[in-house]
């Protein structure tokens, strides 16, 4: 079996490099990465000449969210992969050579895995180009952070493999290579953007955020390995390879559509269940590869979190009429806000996050001038129209006051931390819009 997979992978690689497309992609990929790298180096040199500090040069060149090499190349990868995968299966379908494969003692599993292995090897060539750039950086940067860079390269390689698996699946759906390329590009573009879609709906938000790929590799680029992200790429690769095999089996054995559909749904549901399990905080394992452990709480903070035994709930209250940080954790930004607590969830996985949306009196002169004749509810509805939010999800003043009195905080953006250990409560309310923190003692003292 493995020998057959090896033979198929070798044949695919030979055919790939006989084509100018594979060489052209490597050349363009290298030039693009080199130009980005040169721009980052130039910026650091200019900063140094002007007397500014250039601390954290490795991070700034490769992992800084604002235009670093790995970050930019991550965003460009889905332009390259469809051109490589568009012919992997579709050429067999269009030329009729798939019938020759079917007549030989070879399974669809061997065919698909062999083609995927060829793409994995090609992906190593792309990573090799980036490795050459890192070697250039290593020669001029003192205390070069190799572990962080290697983890970033791993994240990009996993992203290439995931894109390749999707491309192989799309290639199996049609005998037209251009259609396969466009279809792959469309799917990859959707998966790159889907993390920002339908964020106002709780269940859909979790699904779309889980499907988004760039955020997964972004953590690797930052030097953090999380078991959830690692298993995510493995699950995505297995999912699309399995769907491809099911598709070819249906064509080869002329299986009924209902049976094929059932198998596809079964595989998708299995991956969803496994994805849900791996995303549970208690199931996550982390490794921070950065030299300064920038993705991890400081030892003192870890010690404080370790002392917080028992359950803990952080409730965030967002007032629709708050002019300051009212949308700091709005529906659209709920997941990014939750990620702010990920370092704490890493060391206290039983911590719970809740969000409460309401409207109440709040100092907002601009809103008062704009809607002088409207009451609180009418103002809230106008604000929801501006932001495209569902006004029915906001509690009224009477309803929120039954839960908690936030008038002491001016009904602005606040977080409430409640511990439920040993029968006592510890409450902290942080006012983000005024950039301060307060400690409100519970009724039985602290």
Describe these PLM feature segments.
Residues 1-26:
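Aromatic- and glycine-rich beta-strand/loop motifs that create alpha-glucan
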């Amino acid at each position: 079996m493995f020998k057959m997979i090896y033979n198929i992978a070798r044949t695919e690689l030979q055919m790939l490099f006989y084509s100018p497309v594979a060489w052209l992609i490597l050349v363009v990929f290298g030039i693009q990465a080199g130009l980005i790298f040169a721009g980052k180096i130039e910026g650091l040199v200019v900063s140094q000449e002007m007397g500014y500090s250039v601390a954290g040069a490795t991070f700034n060149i490769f992992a800084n969210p604002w235009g670093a090499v790995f970050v930019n190349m991550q965003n460009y990868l889905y332009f390259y992969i469809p051109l490589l995968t568009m012919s992997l299966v579709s050429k067999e379908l269009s030329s009729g050579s798939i019938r020759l494969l079917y007549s030989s003692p070879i399974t669809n599993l061997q065919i698909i895995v062999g083609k995927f292995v060829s793409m994995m090897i090609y992906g190593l060539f792309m990573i090799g180009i980036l490795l050459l750039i890192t070697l250039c950086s290593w020669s001029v940067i003192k205390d070069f952070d190799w572990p962080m860079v290697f983890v970033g390269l791993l994240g990009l390689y996993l992203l290439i493999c995931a894109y390749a698996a999707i491309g192989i699946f799309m290639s199996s759906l049609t005998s037209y290579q251009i259609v396969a390329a466009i279809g792959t590009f469309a799917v990859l573009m959707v998966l790159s953007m889907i993390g920002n879609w339908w964020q106002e709906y709780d269940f859909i938000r979790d699904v779309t955020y889980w499907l988004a790929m760039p955020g997964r590799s972004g953590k690797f680029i930052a030097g953090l390995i999380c078991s959830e992200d690692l298993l995510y790429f493995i699950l995505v690769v297995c999912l699309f390879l399995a769907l491809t095999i099911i598709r070819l089996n249906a064509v080869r054995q002329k299986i009924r559509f209902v049976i094929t559909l059932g198998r596809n749904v079964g595989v998708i549901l299995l991956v969803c269940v496994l994805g849900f399990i791996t995303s549970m905080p208690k199931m996550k394992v982390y490794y921070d590869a950065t030299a300064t452990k920038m993705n991890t709480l400081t030892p003192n903070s870890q010690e404080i979190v370790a002392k917080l035994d028992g359950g803990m709930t952080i409730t965030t209250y967002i007032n629709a009429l708050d002019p300051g940080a009212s949308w700091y954790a709005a529906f659209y930004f709920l997941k990014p806000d939750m990620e702010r607590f990920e370092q704490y969830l890493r060391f206290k996985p039983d911590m719970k996050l809740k969000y409460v949306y309401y409207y109440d009196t709040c100092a907002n002169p601009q809103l008062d001038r704009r809607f002088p004749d409207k009451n609180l509810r009418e103002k809230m509805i106008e604000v929801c129209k501006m932001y495209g939010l569902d006004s029915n999800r906001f509690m009224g003043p009477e309803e929120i006051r039954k839960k908690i009195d936030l008038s002491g905080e001016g009904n602005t953006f606040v977080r409430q931390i409640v511990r439920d250990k040993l029968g006592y409560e510890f409450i902290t309310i942080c006012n983000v819009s005024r950039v301060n923190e307060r400690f409100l003692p519970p009724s039985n003292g602290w």
